[in-house]
Amino acid sequence: MTEQRPLTIALVAGETSGDILGAGLIRALKERVPNARFVGVAGPRMQAEGCEAWYEMEELAVMGIVEVLGRLRRLLHIRADLTKRFGELKPDVFVGIDAPDFNITLEGNLKKQGIKTIHYVSPSVWAWRQKRVFKIGRATDLVLAFLPFEKAFYDKYNVPCRFIGHTMADAMPLDPDKNGARDVLGIPYDAHCLALLPGSRGAEVEMLSADFLKTAQLLRQTYPDLEIVVPLVNAKRREQFERIKAEVAPDLSVHLLDGMGREAMVASDAALLASGTAALECMLAKCPMVVGYRMKPFTFWLAKRLVKTDYVSLPNLLAGRELVKELLQEECEPQKLAAALLPLLANGKTSHAMHDTFRELHQQIRCNADEQAAQAVLELAQ
């Protein structure tokens, strides 16, 4: 009698965020199926959970058109090799984690060979290049979506999709410890505190830092005790911000932080930030915010024509209304930014109402995503 093959799950993660998701998924699957086998493209966290890495995740982690073009031959070789090897292995399910440009084509190749496929983390098809939804529908048996409006979008096009909640919402408490965060950062409990988050990319920091600093100067006039915290993602962004600050606001006292974005948000009465995942994290930290964003005029002109949503920030997309003030392009200037932040720093009705809505939205997307994803994989594997 031949021994039954263990449940075999193939996975491909292309960057750190995908490695974190993959590790959480593997952990949840191992609790249910201890002898399951995991193979594919994995980062250090997935490998620590027992995933066999046929390729290192860094091979796929390229950004920018020039970088991608330089590595295109290698990327195409890896994809062709994975198509062949997964085709021979015939895993019970293939899970492509984010990295849509690489994974969706791979998923399509595998689906044609009769392998069940899942795409974990929806690309922003609901916002732009909506026709990608048809390619995703052809390539995958199931999309796992973090946010409820993403599922609503796929339902409209009859693409199987499961809303699993957001892992970040699982990781962050419903009621953050503001005083604890202030202890960590050395901020007095009774001071007003503003977080400035000018983005994680060089272009964002270049475009936004001067206006954000000038806004903080204006707010200091109303709140002389204002503590300003500026978390920066790495040494490169910190140097860039320090250079801009030396030109624009050399005398403005601020706390520069290496990372610690989450602590800064929890500790602050209000935040001024670039859009993106930071806005979702800020909402989960229950920190009232204003989104300020600026890009090159042609890029903005193009984005306005391509983007199909009324809002750019995730809190507003989740709420379905302008919960958070968004000041874009010409609107993103110090006087307007300061005027939008003043009522939030006052800690009155406006910020309390925003805090309550943030808590409700947090509960909506706090669904134990790792467990939900594992359940979806096992159901498809049957």
Curated annotation (Swiss-Prot):
GO biological process, one term: lipid A biosynthetic process
Domain of life (superkingdom): Bacteria
Pfam families, A to Z: LpxB (PF02684)
Job of this protein: Condensation of UDP-2,3-diacylglucosamine and 2,3-diacylglucosamine-1-phosphate to form lipid A disaccharide, a precursor of lipid A, a phosphorylated glycolipid that anchors the lipopolysaccharide to the outer membrane of the cell.
One Gene Ontology term of the molecular function aspect: phospholipid binding
Annotated metabolic or biological route of this protein: Glycolipid biosynthesis; lipid IV(A) biosynthesis; lipid IV(A) from (3R)-3-hydroxytetradecanoyl-[acyl-carrier-protein] and UDP-N-acetyl-alpha-D-glucosamine: step 5/6
Protein name as annotated: Lipid-A-disaccharide synthase
CDD domains: Glycosyltransferase_GTB-type
Signal peptide, first to last residue: none
Gene: lpxB
Keyword field: Glycosyltransferase, Lipid A biosynthesis, Lipid biosynthesis, Lipid metabolism, Transferase
Catalytic activity: 2-N,3-O-bis[(3R)-3-hydroxytetradecanoyl]-alpha-D-glucosaminyl 1-phosphate + UDP-2-N,3-O-bis[(3R)-3-hydroxytetradecanoyl]-alpha-D-glucosamine = lipid A disaccharide (E. coli) + UDP + H(+); a lipid X + a UDP-2-N,3-O-bis[(3R)-3-hydroxyacyl]-alpha-D-glucosamine = a lipid A disaccharide + UDP + H(+)
NCBIfam families, sorted: lpxB (TIGR00215)
Listed GO CC annotations: membrane
